[in-house]
């Protein structure tokens, strides 16, 4: 008999870290399994239907980004009835750990991934790297990686100075160079902002026949958060789970950026920085006509005063 107090429907929000981990482990054990993977990693598995979502997440990300302080994949379990394997790290480790290698070796040897009709790997940033790298364990999988690094091997990516503390970590042994690990995937989708130079350079390393590089220009360096805000990340994974994710489908969903305040603010700031008052006025008019946006209203008023002073020729007034 299942213990209702350990249902994944029970929120873990508000707990301290130790109690949170204990409750998460209990939920995993009640509905599947829990596997410790050394000091900095552990795995949870929820056993449901024949579609498996494999996510790579961090303790900090789960506790910060999830309203229920649960792994991202739990929402897909609840909504879609999917099975879910979550590999969790304490901090950003890029999952470069022999215990994690061994765990995936064990899954491969047991034919674990072969038990599922569809397997989807997902992660963002360092977790996106891991989603791509470990997807080789499940040939034919679909991979969705948001802002992934291809490798942090300094011989290949010495231009990336963001993660110099990882320079002593090997990215050349097991499950190492993420783009090569995608060769066994059915399809992979790498989501990035081309205006984030280092992210774009990593994205270029993923160029493969089976990889679609999906651009989110102007969205900044927190794409997973923006995707959640726009309510399209779950839709992306849902389409991936039924083999219907495509570039066209992604860009249709991405139209939601027009209502994303973070994106609109970045656009306004960019137009200010580029000294494009004409376009900025058009943008501010559009935003204030559709939503309550005091900052855009104030900027529009300021631009109108500049235009009246003859600083620039304004666009025609809206009818």
Segments and roles (model prediction):
Residues 1-110, 114, 140-319:
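Extended, composition-driven regions rather than compact fold-specific motifs
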Residues 115-125:
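Alpha/beta-hydrolase fold nucleophile elbow
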Residues 123-135:
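Glycine-rich nucleophile elbow surrounding the catalytic serine of serine-hydrolase chemistry
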